[in-house]
Amino acid sequence: MNANETDTRYNLWHKLLGKIFEELLTPVNIMVKTGFPVMAGSPEADVLLIRRNQQRWTEAQRNLLPDGIRDTQADHVLIEFKYSESVNQNVLFQALSYRHLYLKVKKLKPERLHTVIISSKTPSKQFTDGFRLSGERQAWSMAQ
């Protein structure tokens, strides 16, 4: 498979995920964007959900949103989708970079953006053992 075919397949998976979210969530007033640039000339984030016209997710929206998203109070949700690889340090740093850039470009406070990684494969035990859940905000940190 050449690079162009790989790129096309990659984009199709992201468009498919975005379309699923769009079909489910647009009727309940959530804007869905795919291939969303986090800043001019940069790589594109995979999927962005933006809650519109209300302070919290409505019950109808919560019923359609997946675990890990429905309970957030953030009105912007950045989704990094890995259809063929598991979560690893590079994927984590990529998602965090997109998050940082999006916050800067949109001039948002961090609590307004929730970042999620969706992966088709379970992370390796070595990776998960190298990170631990800590603190009352349940943030992941690298084990020392």
Describe each model-derived feature in a short phrase:
Residues 1-144:
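Elongated, amphipathic alpha-helical interaction scaffolds
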